[in-house]
A protein has these predicted regions:
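Cleavable N-terminal export/targeting peptides
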Residues: 1-24
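Surface-exposed loop and membrane-interface regions of Gram-negative outer-membrane beta-barrel proteins
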Residues: 61-95, 100-123
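Residues that define the transmembrane beta-barrel architecture of outer-membrane proteins
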Residues: 45-49, 79-83, 98, 123-129, ...
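Short loop/turn motifs that connect adjacent beta-strands in outer-membrane beta-barrel proteins
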Residues: 20-24, 92-99, 174-181, 210-211
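Detector for outer-membrane/organellar transmembrane beta-barrel domains
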Residues: 120-191, 220
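Outer-membrane beta-barrel "beta-signal"
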Residues: 203, 207-212, 218, 237-253
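Transmembrane beta-strands of outer-membrane beta-barrel pores
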Residues: 31-37, 57-59, 66-70, 91, ...
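Transmembrane beta-strands of outer-membrane beta-barrel proteins
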Residues: 25-31, 51, 60-64, 85, ...
Length: 253
């Protein structure tokens, strides 16, 4: 229930903002065969339901987004939903050529911590700051963790994962007939946990039918197969960073 309360609280905050016109608010809901984040499955390679809302005023934006997950429960935690809250500012440096985006993003996992979870991980709630530059169709984005990254902690050396970072290079290419091709490569550096660092890649194709957006993507990583497996509660040896195809359907309104 707390996860739903967080989402409703975020919705209430956005709706309470002054002078909000319908054009300032955007909503989205979707279903995907897997929730992949930075190449790693958050749902043990199983389907996910997702939804979010965004408010924009000039260059300022705020948003909330949520998805079903499995990885926390698999590690004996108690969170079935991830709730993301974010805000930032977008601006133009060179008209129609170069733009920027800076902001902060907090990932929340309500009720995640249990005694068994806390024996192996720290609090999974994570806050990152990010900055991005977009030149033509290409975007370079860097995210930097101000907290432990998703609960990762090196208990052997008593070192946290604060200062971990993610570098994301992607492009949004109109290939005609209303189709959009999105190639991506990323690098996740996890501080003080050597076998947690990896590179991921994806290639996605989507088409917008008046807000209804089906998509298909090939996703993969070079992540350590011994590190990125479900926790003990899942009783599974599935590699969560394996190469795979993900299909989805999203509705923007």
């Amino acid at each position: 229930m707390k996860s739903h309360a967080l989402g409703l609280a975020a919705l209430a905050t956005l709706l309470a903002l002054p002078a909000v016109s319908h054009a300032d608010l955007a909503f989205n809901v979707g279903a995907f065969s897997d929730y992949s984040y930075r190449g790693i499955s958050q749902t043990r390679l199983k389907p996910a339901l997702q939804g979010g809302l965004d408010y924009a005023a000039g260059g300022l934006y705020l948003g909330a987004w949520a998805s079903t997950i499995k990885w926390v429960e698999d590690a004996y935690g108690d969170a079935q939903v991830e709730v993301d809250l974010y805000g930032g500012y977008k601006g133009v440096l060179i008209k129609d050529t170069l733009s920027y985006d800076v902001g902060v993003l907090t990932y929340l996992y309500p009720n995640a911590k249990t005694p068994i979870w806390s024996a192996a991980y720290k609090d999974p709630n994570t806050t990152e700051v990010y900055g991005a530059l977009t030149y033509s169709v290409a975007t370079l984005k860097v995210s930097y963790a101000l907290t432990n990254l998703f609960g990762n902690y090196n208990f052997a050396s008593n070192q946290d994962s604060k200062g971990s970072y993610y570098v994301d290079l992607s492009a949004t290419i109109d290939v005609g007939a209303g189709l959009t091709l999105t190639p991506h490569v990323g690098y996740q550096k996890v501080r003080n946990i050597a076998n947690a660092t990896y590179t991921d890649y994806s290639l996605a194709l989507s088409k917008d039918f008046d807000g209804l957006v089906p998509s298909i993507a090939v996703v993969g990583t070079d992540a350590d197969k011994s590190f990125y497996v479900p926790g003990g509660a899942a009783n599974s040896t599935k590699f969560l960073g394996k190469s795979r195809v993900i299909v989805g359907l999203k509705y923007n309104f």
